[in-house]
Regions:
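Canonical Rossmann dinucleotide-binding motif of NAD(H)/NADP(H)-dependent dehydrogenases/reductases
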Residues: 15-57
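The beta1-alpha1 cofactor-binding region of Rossmann-like NAD(H)/NADP(H)-dependent oxidoreductases
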Residues: 82-95, 127
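Residue(s) in the substrate-gating loop at a strand-loop-helix junction
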Residues: 164
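Conserved NAD(P)H cofactor-binding loop of Rossmann-fold oxidoreductase domains
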Residues: 112-118
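Substrate-binding pocket helix/loop in short-chain dehydrogenase/reductase
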Residues: 120-122, 129-131
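SDR active-site lid
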Residues: 196-278
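Active-site helix of classical SDR
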Residues: 145, 179-182
């Protein structure tokens, strides 16, 4: 019996390995539009797909970022400036994409643009602090996606949304985790709706990686500004112990972060060019071995783990 079971498990893994490595043909004819290509994941993915021979349409927030990217890639890659928080900018970029892809349609849409700050305990933040992040990470994703869906549907292509492990486990206050939970929900409904048209939707859920989003200096500067603007009452409740905890978190953040960004961009590439893409990709060992298992744990256990690594307020009961 055990022999049959071992053979069955071996055959299953062999079949899975084979399916994972099947790649689409005619890649040089496929157009992929990527947001947030000024740095980090977006920039690396644009270069990676360009080297693969795909027709990359890279959206950058700044002309400087676009110019740097063009200098590192082939003449096939084209750039456009895009602010995902401005509907007129999104509409102009969508028209630009339509003119480039023509009747072929758009094979791939990668929603990568995102921000992480401001981040702090919820009571220290204002409504505008939440709006700032949601405008980019969630509403921007929705606006770009809805603007380009007709082109993706025409190509029977792929939508790849870059979320985070914090879309599975809420680790801290502020709009970032909320935006990623929202992106997960949007992607789930989108995947089901578009499956009728041959379009596949994938979620990339990285752990901690060393990018501009995890910069210690930017994080500390943002948190200190939030603290300085908070009311005396809130400061008294939270106490300066919170300051020390967040400073320690910032110091440890860069040490926790994985430096190999290709672990993420390889997942994004697979979602775009594999014959059988997954619906969810966990990138990084922390995502696979810690945060993904945590998402299946009972709430009381997840809370206990997070309490263990955080400080209680001065006025806690």
């Amino acid at each position: 019996m055990w022999l049959y079971l071992a053979v069955f498990v071996g055959l299953y893994h062999l079949l899975h390995w084979y399916r994972e490595r099947q790649v689409l043909s005619h890649l040089r004819e496929k157009y992929v539009f990527i947001t947030g290509c000024d740095s980090s994941f977006g920039k690396l993915l644009a270069r990676q797909l360009d080297a693969r021979g795909l027709r990359v349409l890279a959206a950058c927030l700044t002309e400087k970022g676009a110019e740097q990217l063009r200098g590192q890639t082939s003449d096939r890659l084209e750039t456009v400036t895009l602010d995902v928080t401005k509907t007129e900018s999104v509409a102009a970029a969508a028209q630009w994409v339509k003119e480039h892809v023509g009747e072929r349609g758009l094979w791939g849409l990668v929603n990568n643009a995102g921000i992480s700050l401001p981040m702090a305990p919820n009571e220290l933040l204002t409504k505008q602090d939440f709006v700032t992040i949601l405008d980019v990470n969630l509403l921007g994703v929705i606006d770009v996606t809805l603007s380009l869906l007709p082109l993706v549907r025409k190509a029977r292509g792929r939508v790849v949304n870059v979320s985070s492990i914090t879309g599975q486990v809420s680790l801290f206050g502020g709009g970032y985790c909320i935006s990623k939970y929202g992106m997960e929900a949007f992607s789930d409904s989108l995947r089901r709706e578009l499956s009728y048209f041959g379009v596949k939707v994938a979620m990339i859920e990285p752990g901690y990686f060393k990018t501009a989003l995890t910069s210690k200096e930017r994080f500390l500067k943002s948190f200190l500004e939030i603290w300085d603007q908070s009311s005396p009452e809130v400061k008294e409740v939270c106490s300066e112990k919170i300051l020390a905890v967040y400073k320690k978190f910032a110091e440890q953040l860069e040490q926790k972060c994985t430096q190999d960004l290709s672990l993420v961009t390889n997942c994004m590439e697979h979602a775009l060019i594999a014959c059988h893409p997954r619906t969810h990709y966990s990138a990084g060992w922390d995502a696979k071995l810690l945060y993904l298992p945590m998402s299946y744990m009972p709430t009381f256990l997840v809370d206990a783990i997070i309490y263990w690594d955080s400080a209680s307020p001065a006025k806690a009961l």
